[in-house]
């Protein structure tokens, strides 16, 4: 199938937006399948800066966008984002955006719960406090509201009763103010006429598009190591972030997903708490942060920085079925005298090639590094792998060998054209 799934292969912020933007020009549809407005990215197109959190990146390139059922949708946040796009001259309408009728709604009460839970934790997870986790909790608890419920005010009110009663018992137990069901219902009834025109049976649309041979680009949020099952639990997000989540989160069968492209920086970053074995809390880490401008798009939070963990990358490749890698921000490594690459771990006196599952075990694991010579000058503007400095080529080759996947794309600068394409993922998906 000529489709491509883009997943983050680390802890997020790998540059997926940049890669998706490049691929979107070749796609017919771009579909979001997980997460919510807790992760964002910035695109610069035609001299205009677009900051996206819920909208699929393809709408900026004039492509049809899809928000799948796996997304936790805050209707107020979506409408605000559509409004910001309008101010930039980009019209988002039901003609170029569809929303799955069974996508979960994020409500004001979820944000309040998120904030209260984070305050109460002995060790904060580092959530963005936007209500995504509590919304997914309600989804799994079978009391969540879905986008399609907006079309049935009577049913909406009854479901909201169940949800609010459940959470108000928790608020009362903590001595916190209870939430008004009537106020939330009034807000949702007011929002419904602006959301419902976008609602479609997305699963059917995507299957029909695939049958017609159209190219679908699946745009993942967060990353493999933040997956609710496979990430560094409990310091994870609340949804599936591996490639198989694209099937569950849109309704297109797994056999139709096509090529899986994992995106990784040439170094590593992480936001919030949780294990990060190659983290650098020294001048080198500060240099990576400054050169890479490692601050959150939505939150402005500084990201933790460290050397690339190719052993972790191998784990992501195997768990998510990654066919090839996009290696981003290679230029950030310009000028380092030497570069280190984690190729495994030492754990209780033994060498292991994967990250243990438990937090206690992870705290005892130590990275095993290989050192590479750095390179002088810059890789910016280089358009072919063979034209990269020999030291950079050696580093990339070792990343491929340890991770167990070929590098198909390399970004060497901030401009869209600063991209080396070794094999187009859409061509790979089509078997070309």
From Swiss-Prot:
Quick check: keyword Nucleotide-binding in the entry? yes
Q: Which UniProt keywords apply?
A: Cytoplasm, GTP-binding, Ligase, Magnesium, Metal-binding, Nucleotide-binding, Purine biosynthesis
Q: What is its EC number?
A: 6.3.4.4
Q: Where is the active site?
A: 13, 41
Its principal location? cytoplasm
Sequence positions that bind substrate:
297-303
One annotated GO biological process: IMP metabolic process
Q: Which residues are recorded as binding GTP?
A: 12-18, 40-42, 303, 329-331, 411-413
**Where found?**
Cytoplasm
Q: Which Gene3D superfamilies match?
A: Adenylosuccinate Synthetase, subunit A, domain 1 (3.40.440.10), Adenylosuccinate Synthetase, subunit A, domain 2 (1.10.300.10), Adenylosuccinate Synthetase, subunit A, domain 3 (3.90.170.10)
Cellular component, GO annotation: cytoplasm
Question: Pathway involvement?
Answer: Purine metabolism; AMP biosynthesis via de novo pathway; AMP from IMP: step 1/2
Enzyme class, spelled out: ligase
Where Mg(2+) binds, per the record, is at 13, 40
Protein name in the entry = Adenylosuccinate synthetase 2
- Species name for this entry? Burkholderia lata (strain ATCC 17760 / DSM 23089 / LMG 22485 / NCIMB 9086 / R18194 / 383)
Q: Which gene encodes it?
A: purA2
